[in-house]
Design a protein with these regions (language model features):
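N-terminal cysteine/histidine-rich coordination modules
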Residues: 229-232
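Interaction interfaces in information-processing and related assembly proteins
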Residues: 1-219
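Conserved small/polar residues in nucleotide/adenosyl-binding loops
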Residues: 220-227
Length: 232
C-alpha cells in the first residue's frame, strides 16, 4: 500500500481527524539511518505523528519540527514535516538495542524521561515553540498530552510500527482525532467510549485496514474528504 494521509470531519464540525499509512516513509528512514528495530519503531512513530501534524499547517511554506529529547539510550529524535505531507527525521543513536519488556519493544525505556518540543516556523520573526514533558515516552501519549496542554485541543493519538522478522518495516501508520470547540458533552462521551473500544494501530494495520477504515471504526460518520500522498 502506498503511503498517504486522509483528513476527515464529522458531526457538523464537532470533530476532525487524520489517519495515515507510512510504511514507505519509515522503511526509507530505516535504510537511510541503518536503525535497529527499536529505533525504527520509535522514529517511525514520531515520523507518522509529525506527518499528520504537518498537514495541519496552513501555508505551503510553513515548516513543523517535532523533537524528543530524553535521557534514554536512543538519544534525541528530530523530525521535520511540511503541509504537503513530506516528512523526514533522524535519531541520535540509531543502533540502540534493549531487551524486550513484557514481550514488547521497550520504547519508553529507549526514550527515557525528557521533553517533547514542537516548533512551528510560519514565517514570523520567531517560530512558535511548545514544550511539554514526556508523560509515557511512548510518543503517541506524549503527542496527545502536547495537544491538550500546549494547543488546548482535546485529542487522541494512535501510532504504530510493525516489523518483519528480517527487521524491515511490515506496516506503519496512525491517527489523530481532535475535538473542536463546538463539541457537545453528549458527543464527547460517545466518541471517547468508541475510541476506548478500538484495537491498537498495529493490530488494525496488521489486519489490512486502510486509513479510511481506521477512521470509520474510530467514529462511524468520519469520512475522508482529502487525501495527501507522496510523503517521502
Amino acid at each position: 500500500m502506498k503511503d498517504y494521509i486522509v483528513r476527515a470531519t464529522a458531526a457538523n464540525g464537532q470533530v476532525r481527524a487524520f489517519a495515515a499509512t507510512t510504511r514507505g516513509v519509515v522503511e526509507t528512514a530505516r535504510k537511510d539511518h541503518n536503525t535497529s528495530p527499536i529505533a525504527t519503531v520509535a522514529l517511525g512513530r514520531l515520523l507518522t505523528g509529525a506527518a499528520m501534524m504537518g498537514i495541519m499547517m496552513k501555508n505551503d511554506s510553513d515548516i513543523l519540527t517535532v523533537q524528543i529529547k530524553g535521557n534514554g539510550p536512543i538519544g534525541a529524535m528530530t523530525v521535520t514535516a511540511e503541509p504537503n505531507g513530506h516528512v523526514k527525521g533522524f535519531v541520535a543513536n540509531p543502533e540502540v538495542m534493549l531487551p524486550l519488556k513484557n514481550g514488547h519493544m521497550d520504547i519508553a525505556g529507549a526514550v527515557g524521561i525528557g521533553v517533547l518540543s514542537v516548533i512551528k516556523d510560519i514565517g514570523l520573526r520567531e517560530p512558535y515553540v511548545g514544550d511539554t514533558i514526556l508523560i509515557t515516552s511512548e510518543i503517541a501519549d506524549d503527542l496527545t498530552y502536547y495537544f491538550a496542554t500546549s494547543e488546548q485541543v482535546p485529542s487522541s493519538v494512535g501510532l504504530g510500527v510493525l516489523m518483519n522478522k528480517d527487521n524491515t518495516v511490515r506496516e506503519a501508520g496512525g491517527f489523530i482525532i481532535q475535538l473542536m470547540p463546538n463539541a457537545t458533552d453528549e458527543f464527547i462521551d460517545k466518541l471517547e467510549k468508541r475510541i476506548k473500544e478500538i484495537k491498537s494501530v498495529t493490530n488494525m494495520l496488521d489486519e489490512g485496514m486502510t486509513p479510511e477504515d481506521i477512521l470509520a471504526v474510530s467514529y462511524t460518520h468520519l469520512r475522508a474528504h482529502e487525501t495527501l500522498s507522496d510523503l517521502v
